[in-house]
Amino acid sequence: MARAAPLLAVLATVLTTAAAGGDAPPGKIAVIGAGIGGSAVAHFLQQHFGPRVQIVVYEKGTVGGRLATISVNKQNYESGAASFHSLSLHMQDFVKLLGLRQRREVVGRSAIFGGEHFVLEETDWYLLNLFRLWWYYGISFLRLQMWVEEVMEKFMRIYKYQAHGYAFSGVEELLYSLGEATFVNMTQRSVAESLLQVGVTQRFIDDVVSAVLRASYGQSASMPAFAGAMSLAGAQGNLWSVEGGNKLVCSGLLKLAKATVIHATVTSVTLHSTEGKALYQVAYESDKGNSSDFYDIVVIATPLHLDNSSNNNITFEGFTPPIEDIQGSFQPTVVSLVHGYLNSSYFGFPDPKLFPFANILTTDFPSFFCTLDNICPVNISASFRRKQPQEAAVWRVQSPKPLFRTELKTLFRSYYSVQTAEWQAHPLYGSRRTLPRFALHDQLFYLNALEWAASSVEVTAVAAKNVALLAYNRWYQDLDKIDQKDLIHKVKTEL
């Protein structure tokens, strides 16, 4: 009888979890990953299914994922995603919902460095900046702006669709609903090809567009046009951050959802079934040993790419047909926070007092770094001022590889400390020819599928809302809300 006790306990768990059906909400939901995607989807799932659903979030690292900070000289600085676009509507909603505040902006000028000299410099006068763009590049910047605005206007439809409860089972279906074949084709055509077609000059692409893409993705203008448009939109709008650190959004959403966070590495998801309902067993390893539990719904909110850079070894067992491998590579990005004195001579300013820039983007050369920013801490007091160029400041250097000592000495006259964070930040666009699906099985979902079309914090939040709606609509068999065509007219009719 003692031997039977564990079996009875497991059976009881299975039967309780499988009490789904009809109008009954799911008993337990697993979310794998506690970055912005996992945190947001936990919040949305609780919002849709109600407060009784039990949500368990597995995280092998730190809550926040690619939203993270590093402490330098007793101040915290963003080491992951640093800012959000003014049109990041989900992120704005999260900040308001959690009672957080946007960080006070400390203005600084930007420039684009071409290896030997600055190819474009921002001034304090808006009209002079426009004149310089026109003088150097003609109306290319206007054509770029029109192209980006057209893409963003269509992309913003997703918020209206989601407000009406519509969801999509695949990335291609989502993109088609927003921009039809044009959006889908933009995942296969390059930024450069698309911009040349609308009259943007090659020189403008080489000098300006490439610099923005290197800053956002660490990639070139040969990357797909859709991801490029999302990146270029971010360069044109007002940017903002969260006072106290962007990662506060993740911890706040998990707390709001009353989610249970288990610090463990998920090793497998196994399909079971009871009374015709899918049931998923999630196995994991933690400091306390190996264990597993059963769930009605599982959301994977961490990359599933398979390449040499991946340490994600989740296996899928019992599925027929087998779960398709998400093949593709990720772009490594190293963020170095350097507390020191900038070597302004390298940028053509022998006198550091005369160096006017706080943000430096780069073209394809030099290749050893992508951006260099004089950054502010996550907590900014009313009396805070940006360090003068001749003073020791905290600089954020973004590079494709860890910086060698010689490279650090190239950028800095001297420094007190260097702290780094290495990220598999974005997909290496072009390494995968097809777009993955959100729905891997009946109630098994892959939230990070959307980053293979474009990657940003807000795009991940959009994917989180889509997956929550998809799970909800599938659970209650509301199929009219999934993968609908011609949604723009349907939504107008509903209004």
UniProtKB/Swiss-Prot annotation:
Glycans are attached at N185, N343. InterPro entries: FAD/NAD-bd_sf, Prenylcys_lyase, Prenylcysteine_Oxase1. It is found in: Secreted. Disruption phenotype: Increased susceptibility to ocular infection by the Gram-negative bacterium Pseudomonas aeruginosa with increased corneal opacity, hemorrhaging and higher corneal bacterial burden despite increased neutrophil infiltration. It comes from the Eukaryota. Residues 1-22 form the signal peptide. GO terms for molecular function: prenylcysteine oxidase activity. GO terms for cellular component: extracellular region. Its main location: secreted. The keyword Membrane does not apply. Keywords: FAD, Flavoprotein, Glycoprotein, Oxidoreductase, Secreted, Signal. Its cofactor is FAD. Belongs to the prenylcysteine oxidase family. Likely to have oxidoreductase activity. Required in the mevalonate pathway to regulate prenylation and enhances the bactericidal activity of neutrophils. This is Prenylcysteine oxidase 1-like. It comes from Mus musculus.
